[in-house]
């Protein structure tokens, strides 16, 4: 299921590819900085969905050193996003961004499949 990701530019009028997991420039820059801090330029950002949160599902992020058998990976801006097959069905066409604001610094997901999201943006329902 390895597919190249399209570069996402939030100010662009180009459509986001609905079959991949997209990454903003801001998120890619943050991942590259975190990889430098860890001293491992091969780390991949794993994005996953778990049950929980105020809307039913929650997003999670961690670093991965290797791919699992059921993983899809998407390369964008010198960063590889990894998602397992179960989470992929909920995340198709989503965009991962990184923001810094009053709520703190965090990765957020804009998910076109979500019918509702919580106010903090970390949980959703389908």
From Swiss-Prot:
Q: Report the gene name.
A: erpA
**UniProt-recorded name of the protein:** Iron-sulfur cluster insertion protein ErpA
Cofactor(s) recorded in Swiss-Prot or TrEMBL: iron-sulfur cluster
Q: Where does iron-sulfur cluster bind?
A: 54, 118, 120
Record note on cofactor: Binds 1 iron-sulfur cluster per subunit.
Molecular function via GO? 2 iron, 2 sulfur cluster binding; 4 iron, 4 sulfur cluster binding; iron ion binding
Q: Where is this region: Disordered?
A: 1-21
GO biological process, any: iron-sulfur cluster assembly
What are the entry keywords?
Iron, Iron-sulfur, Metal-binding
Entry annotated with the keyword Signal: no
Q: Which family does it belong to?
A: Belongs to the HesB/IscA family.
Q: Please name the InterPro entries in this protein's record.
A: FeS_biogenesis (IPR000361), FeS_cluster_insertion (IPR016092), FeS_cluster_insertion_CS (IPR017870), FeS_cluster_insertion_RrpA (IPR023063), HesB-like_dom_sf (IPR035903)
> Quaternary structure?
Homodimer.
């Amino acid at each position: 299921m390895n597919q190249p990701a399209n570069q996402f530019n939030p100010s662009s009028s180009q459509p986001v590819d609905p079959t991949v997991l997209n990454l903003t420039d801001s998120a890619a820059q943050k991942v590259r900085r975190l990889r430098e801090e860890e001293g491992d330029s091969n780390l991949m950002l794993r994005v996953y969905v778990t049950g929980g949160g105020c809307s039913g599902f929650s997003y999670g992020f961690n670093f991965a050193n290797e791919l699992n058998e059921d993983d899809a990976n998407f390369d964008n801006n010198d960063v590889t996003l990894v998602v397992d097959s179960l989470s992929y069905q909920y995340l198709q066409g989503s965009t991962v961004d990184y923001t810094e604001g009053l709520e703190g610094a965090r990765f957020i997901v804009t998910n076109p499949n979500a019918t509702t999201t919580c106010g903090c943006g970390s949980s959703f329902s389908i």
